[in-house]
Design a protein with these regions (language model features):
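Secreted/periplasmic carbohydrate-active enzymes, especially glycoside hydrolases
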Residues: 1-168
Length: 168
């Protein structure tokens, strides 16, 4: 359904360096280009390009504060879309928000939102409590894309020369 008669766009991005470059260079092979498996991902013409999510507890370590910056892109002229964000815990809806966004053709639109989760279950290595953030794009009453981001509320800090996770 994504390849049609006429002109189609296939974009390939190759990163020469990454934060894993040092590990990959341990065998002293310094190659650039594509030398591993490649996957093609079909996306709708208006889609989620990137999502950056931060989830931390508040100062009392009781409630969770979630902030997200979602980048939307459109390849089909100017588009109006509704971004709906649902936060789930074990399949149950914890909180929800929605934001209307207008996207110009071949440009990106950045949408930001915040959520507060009362009595949030905090993530630790011993109790890896995760929430599921569902990001949905709706156009003309139809959901065209859904992306899931697993998030955990935690705060890691160094205080008084001690490494603390969630204040402990």
């Amino acid at each position: 359904p994504f390849v049609t008669t006429g002109d189609n766009v296939l974009a390939v991005m190759v990163y020469k360096w990454s934060d894993g470059t040092y590990l990959e260079d341990q065998d002293f092979w310094r190659l650039s280009g594509i030398f591993r498996d490649v996957y093609l991902l079909g996306v709708p013409k208006t889609h989620i390009r990137n999502a950056a999510v931060t989830a931390v507890p508040d100062d009392s370590f009781k409630n969770g504060l979630l902030s997200a910056e979602v980048e939307l892109a459109s390849y089909d002229g100017s588009a109006a879309a509704l971004l709906r964000a649902k936060l789930l815990k074990n399949g149950r809806l914890v909180c929800e928000t929605q934001i209307a966004a207008g996207i110009e053709e071949r440009k990106n639109a950045c949408v930001t939102f915040d959520m507060t989760v009362e009595n949030a279950r905090l993530w630790t290595a011993e109790t890896p409590e995760l929430y599921q953030l569902l990001l949905e794009i709706e156009q003309d009453g139809e959901i065209t894309e859904v992306q899931r981001v697993d998030v955990g509320f935690r705060k890691v800090e160094i205080r008084d020369r001690r490494l603390l996770v969630n204040g402990v």
